[in-house]
Regions:
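Mobile "lid/hinge" segments at catalytic clefts and subdomain interfaces of large enzymes
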Residues: 114-130, 135-140, 154, 162, ...
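Extended, well-folded interaction surfaces typified by the phenylalanyl-tRNA synthetase beta subunit core
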Residues: 180, 413-579, 718, 770-774, ...
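A carboxyl-terminal module marker
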Residues: 2, 20, 439-442, 462, ...
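Conserved mixed alpha/beta core segments that line enzyme active sites in large multi-domain catalysts
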Residues: 33, 47-78, 246, 259-328
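Class II aminoacyl-tRNA synthetase-like tRNA-binding/catalytic domains
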Residues: 108, 284-324, 328-331, 488-603, ...
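Terminal amphipathic helices with adjacent charged low-complexity linkers/tails
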Residues: 185, 189-214, 391-420
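Glycine/proline-enriched, intrinsically flexible loops and inter-domain linkers
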Residues: 5, 23, 53-55, 189, ...
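Phosphate-backbone binding interfaces of nucleic-acid-interacting proteins
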Residues: 1-202, 206, 339, 358, ...
Length: 803
């Protein structure tokens, strides 16, 4: 939030520099993201008085002799401007001066005549008419006649000022205004706060009745409105234009400027309804009807539903509550009567409507952080005072103040000095704490038993208990008073990883050893990601938990699979020119027992693996899984299964000890064709994905791996080339071979062949077998017996022949 230094000085007698105030604000918990000097980039620009003028023959230029006081009484400068006259005072950039935008002015010849600087326009100094009158005139900026030659230009045109760009935390919505920051400045400097004038006098009766009602008090705890007749549109005074300009707003008209000024100064959003456009002279705060439409002041049309709070007349919505007014009720040059609105709207209601409609404003930003119920009272009074001060209209006696029935009371907190100091860990004198709280507009009533009855200001909704009081005390007392000390506990527990964390770290290291890089994605995506994977409607993955207030529609549901996010990461890499890669992610997915949810969903730890590139294949992922199995002392079995997003002929399910862990394989061709990547990438890319239930995997691990001595006897190797049907999987063959004998210690597939000589629907798969016995050498007879049994079992169970 931008706060001008000069505006703060209207509330507090500040006797420190802007830089010193920045440090003090930081010390009491307010981060000044940037302190912006208005004269940034301007140097050696002074007031110059034109004492001689002469047209430069044959050119459009005028030769001027300028009196710049101590910098020289006869500085010769040529200019192309034509709006000045003899005796005028103008901004003069001297030789070697700088202007905003990094422009440096040097003495040079203009049309053959030496010019020792430049006479400036308002725009060249970064000014506009709202900051300094006449700045937007075509030509030079003409300064007041009493300007003194040689004076630095900054104070003359109001550039001797600073803008504090302050980050307001969510717990301090009361500081979303110049007044809110001024309260803090007054407290930290120990100065009195000068409140802005809020007195006004009703001068006439209403000319016709107005009906105001609130049908949704749970979303609008307080609604205030005041009727003003005989509106007189005009220009705002210079001081108001300057306030608005310093905060980044342009002046529109006196009445519009008053609503914007009240927002900035008091932190209270306001709106004014043109009563000539309000049907039935009725204002109704209610939930929108299904399908109702509104066109807002920025000419955007929205279709509404009962989740949206609106301000309506007798026929239609005329404003989105807390966000923006409607184009059908806004003021214009023909406006003669206005109803000024100040209200408190529920922050959740404003935030949800703003997000759902994609409509934001300065008002909605404040309501989303919170506007207290006391604020409308101050805001409306200040606005009415300004209306009377600027003679914008005639204030009537008709005012409305509708509430949800709750009394407007200060919060009372019972505390003791010992409790507050106990939270802080230091001793602060009682009177010092009382003084600090009183400077922050708390009242402290010391009870007979020594306890304090502390009343919080009406605008401090964030203060609820004595630890909050401790925070207020230490903010002003100074965090530097807290002396670092060691904990005096009897024992200290050393930190470390627990079993699950160690297993996860081991998993990541095993995959990293296979050249896989870890990815990290958000826990949200949208149904579009599930659609992309062709997941059917009845699949469990479709039972996704919807976010009530999503950041965007693309992040609207909690993930039930990691694969969609992994595929998005792969696509992003391909778009950015990364033609190959290996990735993994270990993260929870969120599974609901039923929808809508009525209990906390199960967060299942899941492992997802992805590999992409022209050289990647099925065995890249399978090899990574085998490395995991070996690392944890497990044996994986593979069965022919697939998933909606995988190629039905190049995929498999992973099992361990009879438990299904997950599925992996090549991305289905039809999904690959739909990816938003270049056609040549689709044709050359191989994308493989795998997703495992990590919790099921860890349940198969039986404690820590222990050292097992290598057999002193060398294993016997045998290769088998087998002919089988296309439907037979590698996993089925491996399982049959291993079950034939305990002597089989290793089975590896090393070749697959298809050819006409094998016959239609046939393929050849070659396996390398290792046979070993830790106690003795395996004899040739034993090898022959095991091989015969393997071939017999393969033929009987799977119809496989030796090639």
């Amino acid at each position: 939030m931008k706060v001008p230094f000069s505006w703060l000085k209207e509330f507090v007698d500040i006797d420190v520099t802007a830089q010193e105030l920045e440090e003090k604000l930081f010390s009491c918990g307010f981060e000044v993201e940037e302190l912006i000097p208005l004269d940034a980039g301007i140097s050696k620009v002074v007031v110059g008085k034109i004492v001689e003028m002469e047209k430069q023959e044959g050119t459009h230029l005028t030769k001027c002799v300028v009196d710049c006081g101590a910098y020289g009484h006869e500085i010769r400068i040529s200019t192309g401007a034509a709006n000045m006259k003899l005796g005028d005072c103008v901004p003069t950039a001297l030789d070697g001066s700088t202007l905003p935008g990094g422009i440096t002015i040097k003495a040079r010849k203009m049309q053959g005549v030496e010019s020792n600087g430049m006479l400036c326009s308002g725009a060249e100094l970064g000014l506009n008419d709202d900051l300094f009158p006449g700045s937007e005139v075509y030509g030079l900026l003409i300064l007041p006649e009493d300007s003194v030659p040689g004076t630095d230009i900054a104070p003359v045109v109001g550039l001797d000022d600073y803008i504090f760009d302050i980050s307001i935390t969510a717990n301090r919505p009361d500081c979303q205004s110049v007044l809110g920051i001024a309260r803090e400045v007054a407290a930290v400097l120990g100065k009195p706060l000068h409140m802005p004038a809020m007195d006004y006098k009703a001068v006439c009766e209403p000319d016709a009745p107005i009906t105001v009602k609130v049908e949704a008090p749970e979303l609008c705890p307080r609604y205030m409105a005041h009727y003003v007749r005989n509106i007189r549109m005009g220009e705002s005074p210079r001081w108001m234009k300057r306030h608005l300009a310093l905060c980044g707003l342009r002046s529109i008209s006196n009445v519009v400027d008053i609503t914007n000024h009240t927002l900035l100064e008091m932190g209270q959003p306001m709106h004014a309804f043109d009563l000539n456009k309000v049907a039935g002279r009725t204002i109704d705060v209610r939930r929108a009807h299904e399908g109702e439409k509104i066109v807002t002041l920025d000419e955007k049309e929205f279709t509404l539903n009962p989740n949206n709070l609106v301000i309506c007349d007798a026929e239609k919505p005329v404003a989105l509550a807390g966000i923006m007014g409607g184009a059908n009720s806004g003021m214009d040059d023909n406006t003669t009567s206005l109803l000024f609105e100040c209200a408190t709207f529920a922050r959740d209601s404003v935030r949800k409507t703003s997000r759902a409609l994609g409509q934001n404003s300065d008002s909605s930003a404040r309501y989303e952080k919170g506007v207290d119920r006391y604020s409308p009272q101050l805001g409306l009074a200040r606005a009415l005072h300004l209306i009377q001060q600027l003679d914008c209209g005639d204030i009537t006696t008709l005012e409305y103040d509708l509430t949800d029935g709750r009394p407007l009371e200060r919060k009372h907190i019972v505390a003791t000095p010992a409790k507050i100091c106990g939270v802080l860990g230091i001793t602060v004198p009682d009177q010092t704490m009382i003084d600090i709280l009183q400077r922050l507009e708390f009242t402290v009533d010391v009870q007979a038993d020594g306890s304090w009855d502390v009343s919080a200001p009406l605008y401090r909704d964030d203060v609820e208990s004595f630890p909050d009081l401790a925070e207020e005390v230490i903010r002003e007392y100074g965090y530097d008073h807290i002396v670092p000390t060691f904990l005096n506990t009897a024992s200290v527990t050393n930190g470390g990883l627990n079993y699950d964390q160690k297993q996860q770290l081991k998993t990541k290291r095993l995959l990293a050893a296979q050249s896989f890089y870890e990815a990290s994605t958000l826990a949200f995506y949208s149904n579009a990601e599930l659609d992309m994977l062709h997941i059917p409607a009845e699949d469990e993955a479709r039972k996704a938990i919807r976010i009530l207030n999503p950041i965007s529609e693309n992040l609207s549901i909690m993930r039930t699979l990691l694969t969609p996010s992994m595929l998005n990461v792969i696509v992003d890499n391909l778009k950015k020119g990364n033609a190959e890669g290996r990735l993994f992610e270990m993260a929870p997915v969120y599974l609901a027992k039923e929808l809508p949810i009525n209990e906390h969903p199960h967060e299942r730890q899941t492992l997802c693996i992805g590999a992409f590139g022209p050289e990647e294949d099925f065995f890249t992922v399978k090899g990574a899984l085998e490395a995991l199995a070996a690392g944890f002392g497990l044996t994986f079995d593979y069965q022919r299964e697939t998933a909606a997003w995988l190629h039905p002929g190049i995929s498999a399910a992973v099992y361990c000890n009879g438990k299904r862990l997950g599925v992996f394989g090549k991305l289905a061709n039809e999904i690959n064709a739909e990816l938003e990547i270049a056609k040549e990438q689709k044709d050359s890319q191989n994308i493989y994905l795998g997703e495992l239930d990590y919790e099921a995997l860890m349940s198969c691990v039986e404690g820590e791996l222990r050292y097992k001595p290598l057999s002193p006897h060398a294993p016997v190797k045998r290769d088998l080339a087998l002919v089988c049907g296309e439907a037979v999987s590698c996993g089925e063959i491996e399982e049959t071979i291993r079950k034939a004998s305990p002597l089989v210690s290793e089975v590896k597939l090393f070749d697959i062949y298809r050819g006409a000589n094998l016959g239609e629907g046939k393929k050849s798969m070659a396996f390398s077998l290792s046979l070993s016995d830790p106690k003795k050498e395996v004899s040739a007879e034993e090898v022959e017996r095991v091989v015969k049994k393997i071939l017999s079992n393969l033929k009987f169970k799977l119809g496989i022949e030796i090639r």
